[in-house]
């Protein structure tokens, strides 16, 4: 859900940059060295998911997987997503350098919210209903939160002039809700079987 460069005015860009720096600082302070491989894994997944996208108005539609990453990384999604978004700007010109801070906040903030809402439910052995609840919840909050924040930023910056584009951006992400939720459930199931210790060690990222 990258917002394009040249859409937002300077005050919004500066506010996004300041908030992004604050989030990155918190994430780096809480990131432990033994968690770097997991952080890199989710950063790579976020990067790959965002490279397959369809431009829609002043944004784009693509898998986000931010809610899933937030479940396991907490505040560490800010530095993780920063690297992924920066590489997307450099190699594919997605978004832009000026809007990088805003895009980071749009993607990472819902991920942190998903972490606080669902991290306590993560267990190595989870019933199917719990995996569905956490996976779907993370997918909906991640994608829905990103869409809501992107819409809020656009309305704050452009008012009613962006109303139709905001509606288009939200409606076009309905399939992403479904796909992100399915993938999140699958990842939770897989990690519970192959890497169960990670399900018990989310506290340090909070």
From Swiss-Prot:
Keyword Membrane: yes
Listed GO biological process terms: transition metal ion transport
Pfam families associated with the record: CbiM
Annotated InterPro entries: CbiM/NikMN (IPR002751)
Localization per Swiss-Prot or TrEMBL: Cell membrane
GO annotations of cellular component type: plasma membrane
Location, primary (coarse class): membrane
Keywords recorded for this protein, A-Z: Cell membrane, Membrane, Transmembrane, Transmembrane helix, Transport
Transmembrane stretches, start-end: 6-26, 38-58, 72-92, 94-114, 136-156, 165-185
Superkingdom in the source lineage: Bacteria
Bilayer disposition of the protein: Multi-pass membrane protein
Family classification: Belongs to the CbiM family.
General function of this protein: May be involved in metal transport.
Protein name stated in the entry: Putative metal transport protein HI_1621
Source organism of this protein record: Haemophilus influenzae (strain ATCC 51907 / DSM 11121 / KW20 / Rd)
């Amino acid at each position: 859900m990258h917002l394009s460069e040249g859409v937002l005015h300077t005050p919004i860009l500066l506010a996004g940059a300041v908030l992004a720096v604050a989030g990155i600082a918190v994430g780096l302070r809480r990131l432990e060295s033994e968690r770097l491989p997991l952080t890199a894994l989710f950063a790579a997944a976020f990067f790959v998911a965002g490279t397959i996208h369809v431009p829609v108005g002043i944004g784009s539609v693509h898998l986000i997987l931010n809610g899933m990453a937030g479940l396991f990384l907490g505040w560490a999604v800010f530095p993780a997503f920063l690297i992924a978004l920066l590489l997307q700007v450099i190699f594919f010109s997605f978004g832009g350098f000026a809007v990088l801070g805003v895009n980071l906040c749009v993607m990472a903030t819902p991920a942190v919210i998903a972490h606080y809402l669902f991290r306590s439910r993560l267990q190595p052995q989870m019933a199917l209903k719990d995996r569905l609840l956490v996976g779907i919840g993370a997918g909906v909050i991640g994608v829905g939160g990103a869409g809501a924040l992107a819409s809020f930023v656009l309305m704050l910056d452009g008012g009613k002039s962006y109303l139709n584009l905001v509606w288009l951006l939200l409606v076009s992400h309905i399939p992403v809700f479904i796909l992100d939720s399915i993938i999140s459930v699958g990842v939770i199931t897989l990690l519970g079987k192959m890497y169960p210790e990670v399900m018990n060690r989310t506290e340090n990222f909070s």
